[in-house]
């Protein structure tokens, strides 16, 4: 009997999920994920966004060049884009997927974000903390716009 060799492939991790309630309707909240001027108010220092399937998704988030492309854009209900860090060997540009759902609840919007395909638990933990923090900022920004 020979001992098994540990796999060198990263194990898939559970998706990161975060949800917030924003005091504004979905048509006010949705553009914060598609309009570069609004993205720089809550998550990025600079943004280049072409919000159509196949369009560029590029944010500079605290010195990290997040890069990908829009996969689905269904205003004001759902947006999905690929995500990764330009130049990263562990999480290359476009190798994970972020889905954001916008659900009207009275005059508010419940935003539910799911980030899939992160390669390691360390990336999962850092992205969970990051998304939770940035969505908290979004609550104040988009809520004041509604």
Q: Where are the regions that the model predicts?
A:
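Short acidic N-proximal helix/loop "leader" segments that mark the beginning
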Residues: 1-17
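A conserved amphipathic terminal alpha-helix motif
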Residues: 2-3, 117-146
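Short Gly/Pro-enriched turn/cap motifs at secondary-structure boundaries
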Residues: 10-11, 59-61, 91
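Short beta-edge strand/loop motif at the mouth of beta-sheet-based domains
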Residues: 17-18, 24, 36-69, 78
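Conserved catalytic core of Hanks-type protein kinase domains
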Residues: 32-33, 73
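Hydrophobic-ligand binding "helix-grip"
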Residues: 47-50, 63-110, 116
């Amino acid at each position: 009997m020979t001992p098994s060799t540990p796999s060198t492939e990263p194990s898939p991790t559970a998706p990161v999920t975060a949800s917030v309630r924003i005091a504004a309707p979905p048509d006010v909240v949705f553009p914060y994920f598609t309009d570069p001027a609004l993205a720089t108010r809550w998550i990025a220092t600079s943004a280049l966004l072409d919000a159509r399937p196949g369009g560029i998704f590029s944010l500079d988030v605290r010195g990290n060049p997040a890069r990908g492309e829009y996969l689905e854009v269904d205003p004001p209900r759902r947006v999905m884009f690929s995500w990764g860090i330009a130049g990263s060997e562990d999480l290359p540009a476009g190798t994970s997927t972020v889905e954001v759902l916008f659900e009207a609840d009275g005059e508010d919007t419940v935003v539910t974000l799911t980030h899939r395909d992160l390669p390691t638990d360390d990336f999962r933990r850092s992205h969970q903390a990051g998304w939770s923090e940035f969505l908290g900022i979004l609550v104040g920004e988009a809520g004041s716009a509604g």
